[in-house]
Amino acid sequence: MLNDFKIDPLVKNKSPSATTAVVAMSGGVDSSVAAALLHKLGYKVIGITLQLYNNTTGKGACCGSLDTQDAKQVASIMGFPHYTLNYEKVFKEEVIDDFIDTYMQGKTPIPCIKCNQVVKFRDLLNATKSLDADILVTGHYIRKIEQDDDIYVYSSKDTKKDQSYFLFATTIEQLKFLRFPLGNFHKDNIRKLAEHFNLPIANKPDSQNICFVADTYKNTIAQLRPNAIKKGNIIDTSGNILGQHDGIVNFTIGQRRGIGLSSKEPLYVIKLNPDTNEVTVGHKSALLQNKLHIEKINWLVKDKIPHTGLNVKVKLRSSHSGSTAIVYPNDNNKATVLLQDTYCTVTPGQACVIYDGDRMLGGGWIC
């Protein structure tokens, strides 16, 4: 069966037996198979799981204590070493606190991108280098191709599982050290390979939830930052008060359910104002836009965005199939995106990821 899972050498001019690969193991199917496959192919695998938070439920998330046990069991079955690193402090300070701060600013965060950006691909990558390993490997569904000293990043062959959206903030320097061996395969075949290796996680469900949110965002924020929950007014687009809310952290742009108001026509959250603590609601027509602004751009291409604009495809959320757009550069690492032939809900705090076909060019944060 291994003949169906051929991968190119992960390090140029170096055999698998001479290559030390640290594999970031979340305890799920994908990273477990990535580690097991490389071990079978002769790589010197070291499995590392990050302890990020205190959660023993293991329900629909990742990197909890039960997931650490699963990762250790996989390593034991396959016969390669496994270690757990405690990153709870940095995860709390740079991911969880940022998650709460972003909601308090009236934006909708994506903590998984932040975790990749600062914990996995900064701190874990540095730890990998300190072990004198050659590469850091993950189970993400994304493709990376190196050619003539250039790095090209593409969406996964399995478009339903593609995770390029969540990795847009990964820098070229980080990508030089990272490897994604599952990018050319489909998830169904990865599960079959897990069964072939007799791994106990072969039928483990995919993680769906934000790992540190045990039940709801509101309860998590209220527990960690009680002063973030402040009552305020719900107003219409003309400024008329329609009712009250229990905190803007309970809302996101485009939200329809849970507003707490009755109306003949559906009402949507149009705007969140943290300065006045007001939630503006209105009809769907007031929600759709064809222009947005992005900041803190991570650009993976040598050529800069031309001032005349660049024709691209953009994804405004992970499940978004993509919209054609023109991107115009601005000062201070910002850009303006004009959607072509479509209007979308634009949610500050989310990512706008930019593609040329299936090649990821980079992206930025919607502001």
From Swiss-Prot:
It catalyses: S-sulfanyl-L-cysteinyl-[protein] + uridine(34) in tRNA + AH2 + ATP = 2-thiouridine(34) in tRNA + L-cysteinyl-[protein] + A + AMP + diphosphate + H(+). Residues 161-163 are annotated as: Interaction with tRNA. Coiled coil: none annotated. GO terms for biological process: tRNA wobble position uridine thiolation. Its EC number is 2.8.1.13. The record marks H140, Q350 as: Interaction with tRNA. One of its GO terms (molecular function) is tRNA binding. Disulfide bonds join C115-C211. It is found in: Cytoplasm. Catalyzes the 2-thiolation of uridine at the wobble position (U34) of tRNA, leading to the formation of s(2)U34. HAMAP family: tRNA_thiouridyl_MnmA. This is tRNA-specific 2-thiouridylase MnmA. It comes from Ehrlichia chaffeensis (strain ATCC CRL-10679 / Arkansas). The gene is mnmA.
